[in-house]
Amino acid sequence: MTDRIARVERTTKESSITVELNLDGTGIVDVSTGVPFFDHMLTALGSHASFDLTVHAKGDIEIEAHHTVEDTSIVLGQALGQALGDKKGIRRFGDAFIPMDETLAHASVDVSGRPYCVHTGEPEHLLHAVIGGYPGVPYATVINRHVFESIALNARIALHVRVLYGRDQHHITEAEFKAVARALREAVEPDPRVTGVPSTKGSL
């Protein structure tokens, strides 16, 4: 299997993003987006997926975090898709249940080449909840769905994320990110029993 490494840069009038990703890493993570809670979530994602992940982002956080979070998620998805390459020899499917105190989240991944995202189960108060700030740039949890959609669509994977139950917005969001991390780790792992592309069609 060739090196599964990617580097993607994206610059707009709203942000400048660089993501470096090694799918066969050991969880070495260096994240700086200017949004502390989002840094925390991306660090958890890289660590629990055992990816080596570097994310450097500068955006118009003086307005709010939305553009930076959205654009970083787009570039992360692009890097994931690029690093996957021809997808030969991978497991393709992965899923994980992750508890965090009172919360339980589940994620399921299909590295299918058909982008789709289902995000369900978050309690209604996460539409209005904010984490962090005071001082610093706050993270509005309403963007959680958009993060996962952006990753899935740009990586061209099917990603389902659901919250079975939970109350605390920090615990819910973190459990979601960790569930996605563990599901991705399983899906992209080499399968010694698979030599080609894991599809009856012969391509993904």
Curated annotation (Swiss-Prot):
Q: Which InterPro entries match?
A: IGPD_sf, ImidazoleglycerolP_deHydtase, ImidazoleglycerP_deHydtase_CS, Ribosomal_Su5_D2-typ_SF
Query: Which is a Gene Ontology cellular component entry for this protein?
Result: cytoplasm
Q: Which pathway does this chain act in?
A: Amino-acid biosynthesis; L-histidine biosynthesis; L-histidine from 5-phospho-alpha-D-ribose 1-diphosphate: step 6/9
Task: Report the EC number(s), separated by commas if there are several.
Answer: 4.2.1.19
Catalysed transformations (reactions): D-erythro-1-(imidazol-4-yl)glycerol 3-phosphate = 3-(imidazol-4-yl)-2-oxopropyl phosphate + H2O
State its location(s). Answer: Cytoplasm
| UniProt keyword annotation of Lyase present | yes
What Pfam families does the annotation carry?
IGPD (PF00475)
Keywords (A to Z) from UniProt: Amino-acid biosynthesis, Cytoplasm, Histidine biosynthesis, Lyase
Q: Which GO terms describe its molecular function?
A: imidazoleglycerol-phosphate dehydratase activity
Enzyme's top EC category: lyase
Domain of life of the source: Bacteria
The answer on whether this UniProt entry bears the keyword Lyase reads yes
Chief location: cytoplasm
Which biological process terms from the Gene Ontology are attached to this UniProt entry?
L-histidine biosynthetic process
The similarity comment for this entry is: Belongs to the imidazoleglycerol-phosphate dehydratase family.
The name this protein goes by in its record? Imidazoleglycerol-phosphate dehydratase
The organism named in the record is Rhodococcus opacus (strain B4)
Q: What is the lineage of its organism?
A: Bacteria, Bacillati, Actinomycetota, Actinomycetes, Mycobacteriales
Gene designation per UniProt: hisB
